Amino acid sequence: LIENDLSLEHRKKINDFITLKSKDTLWSKFVLMLGIQMKTGLDPNIIVSIENKDIDETNRSIKLPNKLISFSKPNDDDLWDSIMERKSNSKYLFYRTRIQFYPRYKYSLEVDQDLDLPTSPEFFKRRFKQMKSVLNL
């Protein structure tokens, strides 16, 4: 989804967006998925299917069927820390959730839907489209 020939301006906008939205309830899951995609070039279908059992905390890596992805470089620290924060007792790193809004309190919360099912690839595509609109890309 991210073209290799993105202009530097677009890359900067996306990197700033990732930094700004990494703790935002609505965007944090997508932003982590996007960060993994930008580092690895993995297809969103593969990213949503990452299982927690394949995350090696000791070696700072994720084992995929045909690939081992290392997060051992110093500039990977923020991304790895976010992966560790996201990791849980669920089967998948990105399991099914929904956002519950409380307009009266101007508050939103990510609510678990199914710990045994991965987030759909459509979630990534939908949020990617929203991000492009927000950033005027």
Spans of model-derived segments:
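Basic, Lys/Arg- and aromatic-enriched nucleic-acid-binding interface segment
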Residues: 4, 8-44
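Short, charged phosphate-coordinating catalytic segments
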Residues: 37-59
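Helix-turn-helix-type domain boundary/helix-start signal
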Residues: 4-5, 69-73, 135
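Basic, alpha-helical nucleic-acid-contacting "clamp/cap" segments
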Residues: 58, 63-117
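Short, basic (Lys/Arg/His-rich) helix/loop patches that form interaction surfaces
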Residues: 19-26, 40, 114, 122-137
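Residues in the recognition helix of alpha-helical DNA-binding motifs
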Residues: 50, 82, 86, 127, ...
